[in-house]
Design a protein with these regions (language model features):
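OB-fold ssDNA-binding interfaces and closely related basic DNA-contact patches used
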Residues: 1-165, 244-252, 256-259, 286
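Terminal short linear interaction segments
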Residues: 280-286
Length: 286
């Protein structure tokens, strides 16, 4: 990899991200938004200028419905993301292994999802062409992550590993999202070989109409500082997608949800009787 490709001497974890105007920072492609229920785009992965060694941020989270207020809830990051004890996961297994059908069903309410967040630059978006050239955060599940991992560490002998975050040599990623049982299906997404001038990082300028004008295809002769300044100014703050520790309000909320379904708080202390005990079986005997 060239010196320009990794920019290690310019990336600075201690440098604060610039204050950005409120605008679209996350790419959320879905078959639901596409003609014929097939969303197609070409993207390239972009290193996180503040910490390139952590250009993929992984975490578990859970959407906890509020049992006291129907149709409300909040997403809570799982402490297991950083190897800490997780009351949400503990409650899931407590209910799952209870042997009671109602509790087993309620365990689903504490099921976690695993997401990987990273930066991408849109090369071509057939559904939202105004995004072409823009750098956004893309949160993906295990299917896309495994394709990235295989690109970096091939499972077949003889295939050379490639770094998709290499701003010059990283391959383009074709996104083709179809529908499968009402969900997004990523089976047809893949890395492809296209001309390097098309797949490399592009320096762009935002126009008055909201589109992005391509200024320069980054190459070995590009000015390092110019490239770094572009990434710093145009990349959303990926740090916002890291695991977020629980504040006191989150602790109280999680405790209240756990107490509703188990009769005890996350710490194991007895809770007040729930308002609708018929919604769950008692766990005091478990």
């Amino acid at each position: 990899m060239s010196n320009l490709s990794n920019l290690d001497n310019l990336f600075a974890p201690t440098v604060q991200a610039p204050i950005q105007e409120k605008e679209l920072i996350e790419w959320r492609p879905s078959f639901r938004n596409a003609p014929n229920k097939t969303y197609t785009a070409i993207v390239r992965f972009v290193p996180w200028w503040q910490d390139p060694s952590n250009s993929i941020l992984e975490k578990f989270s859970c959407y906890l419905e509020n049992p006291y207020q129907p149709n409300t809830g909040r997403t809570v990051d799982s402490p297991s993301s950083i190897g800490e004890k997780d009351p949400i996961s503990d409650t899931y297994w407590l209910l799952k292994n209870s042997g009671n059908a109602i509790n087993v069903e309620n365990a689903k309410k504490f099921s976690r999802t695993q997401k990987y967040s990273m930066l991408i630059q849109i090369i071509s978006d057939s559904v939202n062409p105004k995004l072409n050239g823009k750098i956004l955060v893309w949160r993906v599940g295990k299917k896309v992550y495994e394709k990235i991992a295989t690109e970096m560490t091939p499972v077949i002998a003889g295939i050379q590993p490639r770094n998709p975050f290499d701003i010059i040599n990283g391959r383009a990623f074709v996104v083709k999202i179809t529908e499968a049982s009402g969900f997004n299906n990523y089976d047809n997404c893949q890395f492809v070989d296209i001309d390097k001038s098309q797949s490399c990082l592009k320096l762009t300028e935002k126009q008055e109409d909201g589109t992005y004008k391509f200024v320069e295809a980054v190459s070995e002769t590009s000015d390092k500082q110019k490239v770094f300044d572009f990434l710093q100014a145009n990349s959303p703050d990926l740090g916002k997608f890291k695991y977020q520790p629980w504040d006191e309000e989150t602790v109280r909320y999680v405790d209240s949800v756990i107490a509703f379904y188990t009769g005890r708080t996350a710490s194991g202390a007895p809770a007040q009787p729930i308002a609708s005990p018929q919604k769950t079986a008692s766990l005091e005997s478990i």
